[in-house]
Amino acid sequence: MKQNFNFIQSIRLSTRTDDDFCSNNAIRGILWNIVYFPCDLYADCKDNNVEKIKEYIQHVPISQINHVESNGSTSLHVAAYYGFNELVKLLLKNGASRSIRNKHNLTAYEEARTSTIREIFKRFNDEDRFLSNIDINYEWILVCEETFLQREHFRQQLLKTFARDSTEDLSTKFDTVYDRIKEHYIILFEQENLPQRQQLLIDWFFMNASIEKNPIWIVKAYTSTTDFYKILNRHLAMYVLEYFHPTLNKSIDYKLVNCLIDFVGIFIHSDGLDKLNYVGQCYRGMLMTKDDISQYTIGSQVMNMTLLSTSKQKTIAEIYAGDGQSKLMRQTPDFKLIHFSTVCTYTVRNKHTALDIHQISEVTDEEEILILPFSTFRVTSMKQNDPKKNGILIELELEECCES
């Protein structure tokens, strides 16, 4: 048996394998598991060989699915360009990256032949990316006077971990950070019951970050259609403050905490992300209870512990907040609303508070602006709309506190 396996391993397949040799389906299946050429997938996509691709795509490494051909395009580009709906779905399901640009500087979404194809690229069953529908305290800390001082303290502490003026070479430091994340954080995803292809795709993003010494790959991982952003934000909300606590807690995994600080340091202090700094307005949807609303008084200050996905398009936030769906909101037995659809308008004034990531996002149509942790905003306006109009019920405006 071992002899036969070694014999099969020694066979080098050409792009077009001899038909007689591969007439045996079992042998062909074994060979596909051992050697596979990206150009085969690209050619099969161009020919729309969906059934053939279904037979082997689960065995194709993510790096080969996202291989850039000599003409500058990926398999996803060619499938979208020719309008092959089922094939686009299959590639996306198996880890095709949406953000790769070809030699024309276009993503597969931008080259899509039809509006139907473009719809496939949009997120589905991911209603809380631009929507805060969990416990507000899970995401925000509300303080009256000291919020901005805490923000300054937290960010200065981060500089000690990921300093711009560090004498250590940036690429060396990035390797150290990546290795720590890989060893102590990415491995946790095995406990999250993620689909295998999601795990492989997340690992692919971080592998590229390490190879290229480029933190943009970590941003891409966050924007991907995996559950990476949900898990990271949950951990940030639960544990990131432990890093700043003066006493140790034996129940806390400080390797996890240090990895979370690495993530925040990369997003805030990495020179590689400076070109993405954003100043301006952005929008996010929220589902709020009466108790939540009562905390957002004019003049109150809030500081976020997590990464917040917002959009330059107000309509995106309105859709996620349930605009026009008030009749479907959670209600009491006597038909009084429990959840109120809310749209927050954030005015970002300082650098290193938000990143404009829509050009590198896996879903460019969302025009995503990412608000970074330890950012402080003051509530400047609250408007309550007529519930009979079945629109957004609460409109909040928040303006970032000035840097000292």
Located regions from the model:
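Mono-ADP-ribosyltransferase
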Residues: K2-I34, P38, Y42, E55, ...
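Residue-level marker of regulatory loop/turn positions in helix-turn-helix DNA-binding domains and
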Residues: N33, C45, V68
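Charged, surface-exposed interaction regions in soluble eukaryotic proteins
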Residues: N66, N71-S73, H77-N85
